[in-house]
Structure formats: structure tokens, C-alpha cells
Amino acid sequence: MKSGRINMRILYIQYTNPAGYPPLQHGSRILAENGFKVLFLGTGARGAAALEFPPHPNVNLRRLTFCPAGWRQKLHYGLFTLWVLFWVLRWRPRWIYASDCLSCPVAALLSLVPAVRIIYHEHDSPNGTLDKSSSISERFVRSIRGLVAQRANLCILPNQRRAESFKERTRTERLVLNVWNCPSSKEVKERSSRSDSFVLFFHGSIVPARLPMAIVEALAKLPTEVVLRVAGYETIGHSGYIQALQNYASKLGIGHRLSFLGSFVHRDTLLENCSHADVGLALMPLKTADINEQAMTGASNKPFDYLACGLALLVSELAEWKKMFVDPGYGLACDPGDPDSIAKQLLWFLQHPVETRSMGIKGRQRILSEWNYETQFSPVLQAIGAKGVQD
């Protein structure tokens, strides 16, 4: 680069499919609309392999094929590292935007490159502390995570509790921002006219913690006009769970009221389907040892997406969730493990259509005014501007 020339290139790296992460889609698009050239380097992903970013002239995505766990994956990661280094030398980005722990070894190497600056965005935090049972690779990645946190120009986490834990565990003195996983304001939709059915909607990874069997049992307790539509994918750890849900629904005689829509390639299609529903399900277990499940307000994009489509919310009876979504009047709370508790709240929605619709309208207004990614991401833009992009 010639002295004085503005370098507006940012390289995103993530050892999975970046298109499975809405905040990356929104953030990269905001940067692209502010003049940045954006390149994503990632891999395929089981379950989320079909997901894609919408096209944008300033955003490009390249991926290696997916490699399952095992010794081949270690070689695959080495290849990924070399591939990223090649693109850094070829493309010469000013900023590296590294996502999650598995990007940290590569980001640590790139932090040694002169004039390259690092942004570290942790979508999912590692659980617990290291002990004798921890693998060598886990210890290595965790230690490198701390190094990246200390070298990065900026760190981003989607929840305040996670951000505080991150600062404490990594001992970083760098700027750490709390950026919620909100939808883009451009994704806000008018709720479609109501059909003859009362539609519940769920989207995301289809796992017991997010879509418990109790939901199916609750559905069986409700009038036949109540149906559940599920969009998303199974994870490696819960292969076969969709079939288990279908089998249970059939056993209860409500198989025709439970629909699996699969994964939509683009978010626009997902949100269009969402806008035809009445209530969005955003449930978390009441008790869990997982730090990510303990601290999901702001980090879970589900409730924000539902509100953007004008849906009322059904969330778990957790203090933070009730304060954020129930107290302002955007939905109701239940015990996600109790079919009777779930059914009681869903029946209230069914019997109070005017109030239910009002919840969705209020929530959509909150998305437009505050809970949108343009607002959430603005401190990141300011931080990048403060640090400069000029060589």
C-alpha cells in the first residue's frame, strides 16, 4: 500500500460457516455500506451448510469443505490456517475480524503482522475452567484466546455477563463492547394477515434445551387450531432429535399440527415465514451449567427476530428474560419443562388475540427504535474510526 492511501479492507475468519451467524451478516453489511471491502474465509458446517449471505457487491464469502472431528480435522485446520495466511498476503486487509475460539490461533499469528489490526467477536464462550480432564487442544485454544483478547484492538461479546467474565478470565485491558444480536432495521416486517390456524413459530438449532419435548405435549393440550412450525437444523450432538419430536407428536395424535420447514438459505425467507405466525418461542432451561445458556439475553437472536416480524413472545421464567421481554409487555413467561405451564400461556394468547397482536406491535416498534443491529453496531464503527484506517 502506498503511504496515505486509505485501506478499507476487512477480513472475517471463522472455522465454520459464517452465514450461520446473523450478526456477522448484519455487521459486514453495515461495514460494506460504509465503504469497506469485506471478505469472509470460513468452512462448511454440518446442519448449517446450506445457509448463505445475501449478495452484496462489497461482500465476498469463500469456504473450505466441512471436515468432521478426528485427526483429519487437525490437518484440515492446518490447511485453513495456511489458506488464511495466503489471503492476508494476497489481499492485504487492514482489519482481521476473528469469530469464536477456533479462530484464535490464526488471529494470534496475524496479530504479529505489521499494520494489521484485530477485532475478536466471541459468539459462544467456552464453559468452565480448565482441569486435568481438559484435552491438550482445548488447553491450547483457551490459552491462545487469552492472548488474542490481550492483543486485539477491540473485543465484542453479545451479553454483559459474558463480557464481564471474558475480561476477568482473559485479563484483557482492551476495549470490550457488548453488542446484542439484534436484526437489521431493514428486516422489520409487518405481520401477515392471520390464517385460520393459530401459529407458533420456532427457528434455530433444534436441540432439547431450545425446543423441549414439553412443547409437543403442551400442543396436545391446546385446541386443534394451534399449530407449531419449526425452521432450523439439527446439531452434531443431537442428531435424530427432529425424528424424536415427530414420533412423539404422532404418538399424541397431533403429528399433523407439527411442521418442520428445514433450513432456509437466506434470512429473508426465514423471516417471511416467521411473519405468518402469531407467537414466537424463545425458551431456555431454567437450570443449566452452560455459561452461554445462563447468559443469553441479548445473545439470543430469536426473540428479536420474532419481534421484528410482529410476533408476541413466549420466554422462560428467568429473571433477566422477564425483565427484558415480559415486563415491557412483549410477551409471557413459562416453565419450559412443564407442559401445563406452556399450555396455559399459549391458551391465553389464543383467547386474547387483540392483546397478543398489540405485544407484537410494541415489540416491533422497539426493534425499529433501539433493538436493531445498526444501533448496536455503531460503537464498533466508532471504535474502528477512532483507531483509523489510514496506512
Predicted features and spans:
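N-terminal strand-loop element at the rim of the active site
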Residues: 14-19, 30-76, 161-167, 176-178, ...
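Nucleotide-sugar-dependent
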Residues: 22, 210, 266-273, 280-304, ...
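A short, well-ordered alpha-helix in the C-terminal region of glycosyltransferases
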Residues: 341, 348, 355-369
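Membrane-proximal helix-turn-helix segments that form the acceptor-binding/catalytic region
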Residues: 29, 82-90, 105, 109-113, ...
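Conserved acidic donor-binding segment of nucleotide-sugar-dependent glycosyltransferases
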Residues: 300, 327-339, 348-354
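Nucleotide-activated donor-binding/catalytic signature segment of Leloir-type glycosyltransferases, i.e.
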Residues: 242-273, 279
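Conserved donor-binding/catalytic core segment of Leloir-type glycosyltransferases
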Residues: 11-13, 156, 192-219, 229-230
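Donor nucleotide-sugar binding/catalytic pocket of nucleotide-sugar-dependent glycosyltransferases
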Residues: 42, 142-188, 195
